[in-house]
From Swiss-Prot:
Gene3D superfamilies: Medium-chain alcohol dehydrogenases, catalytic domain, NAD(P)-binding Rossmann-like Domain. This is Probable cinnamyl alcohol dehydrogenase 3. The keyword Nucleus does not apply. Binds 2 Zn(2+) ions per subunit. It comes from Oryza sativa subsp. japonica. NADP(+) binds at residues 55, 173, 194-199, 217-222, 257, 281, 304-306. Keywords: Lignin biosynthesis, Metal-binding, NADP, Oxidoreductase, Zinc.
């Protein structure tokens, strides 16, 4: 079925405004969106905040070669429920909620039945994806969205929407590998490779789990930030042979958040025997992994991609309990193109969040 932009759902469509890229220039400008009517199992959400993920930048510029234009990005959505379908029991109008990287799946395969909707072969992403009815999904750089209730997360009262929105991508991306690879047991020693949008959240979750945390970075200037502000226990400059040697075979696991191509052997050497390195960054080119680096010490190299819906709800509740939030810079909708330029230069600490509720309609009217 060819992708279409208009909703195929029965009933009256709901009009929204968004910011869309029309081509690989990536320039975002106002765009009228027709959302489907609120179905029996759906939740309609007024979007108040939406985080900017680095993948948004890749997609608007078609750097991954699968962009469908016009493209409305955004999969770190936080807002308020305005309407629910007749079968919805978990949510009601006025609830504070979020939507992350997925808005649908088959809901019946082994992965879905085991709570791993993120591994469903028929999974539908929040934007730049084709839903079951053939429509193209539009993301959270928009005034409202309609989502099946299974893919909506309830925000705890203690979690502010603006600093919580990025956790729906960055948070679950680092939380899941810690949980499923045994790196959430107090006293374990975890390394966080890279201190950016993912890395700074990984440090915070590691501290919430009671772990010893070492930040590994190529930027010596981030040492004070890591130790004094984020609370890491140690900092290793990856270009220092002396510091890397001192940290050799000391870590139970490493969460690798780096998207640049880096040699794996020096970082695998930081692991204890039976240690695990989990990749959550996506380098453009294949990685060089000398087999001896894994075989010697029985080390494991694994990957992890976001998380299922139950884990996402669990993550946001644990984050609220322990005060884990993203460090953000709130911007208006009219500043989004400048923010994208800055993001391309890594000029943000650590996540941009669009104040959709207060600024999108004004930006669209200009």
């Amino acid at each position: 079925m060819a992708p279409t932009a208009a909703s195929a759902a029965a009933g009256e469509e709901q009009q929204a405004v968004g910011l869309a890229a029309r081509d690989s220039s990536g320039h975002l400008s106002p765009f009228a969106i027709s959302r489907r009517s609120t179905g029996d199992d759906d939740v309609a959400i007024k979007i108040l905040f939406c985080g900017i993920c680095h993948s948004d930048l890749h997609c608007i510029k078609n750097e991954w070669k699968h962009s469908i234009y016009p493209l409305v990005p955004g999969h770190e959505i936080a807002g308020v429920v305005t309407e629910v379908g007749k079968n919805v029991t978990r949510f009601k109008a006025g609830d504070r909620v979020g939507v992350g990287c997925m808005v649908n799946s088959c809901r019946s395969c082994e992965s879905c039945n085991n709570g791993f909707e993120n591994h469903c072969p028929e999974g539908v992403f929040t934007y730049n994806s084709v839903d079951k009815d053939g429509t193209v999904t539009y993301g959270g750089y928009s005034s409202m969205v309609v989502v099946h209730e299974r893919f909506v997360v309830m925000f705890p009262e203690a979690m502010p929407l603006d600093v919580g929105a990025p956790l729906l991508c960055a948070g679950i991306t680092v939380y899941t590998p810690m949980k499923y690879h045994g790196l959430n047991a107090p006293g374990k020693h975890v390394g966080v490779l890279g201190l950016g949008g993912l890395g700074h959240v990984a440090v915070k979750f590691a501290r919430a789990f009671g772990l010893k945390v070492t930040v590994i970075s190529s930027s010596p200037g981030k040492k004070r930030e890591a130790l004094e502000r984020l609370g890491a226990d140690a900092f290793v400059v990856s270009s220092s042979a002396e510091e890397m040697e001192a940290a050799r075979s000391t870590m139970d696991g490493v969460i690798n958040t780096v998207s640049a191509n880096t040699p794996m052997a020096p970082y695998l050497a930081l692991l204890k025997p039976n240690g695990k390195m989990i990749l959550v960054g996506l380098p453009e080119n294949p990685l060089e992994v000398p087999p001896f680096s894994l075989v010697h010490g029985n080390r494991t190299l694994a990957g992890s991609n976001i998380g299922g819906m139950a884990d996402t709800q669990e993550m946001i509740e644990l984050a609220a309990k322990h005060g884990v939030t993203a460090d953000i810079e709130v911007i208006g909708a009219d500043d989004v193109n400048t923010a994208m330029e800055r993001l391309a230069k890594a000029d943000v600490r650590y996540r941009f969040v669009i104040d959709v509720g207060n600024t999108l309609h004004a930006a669209a009217a200009e």
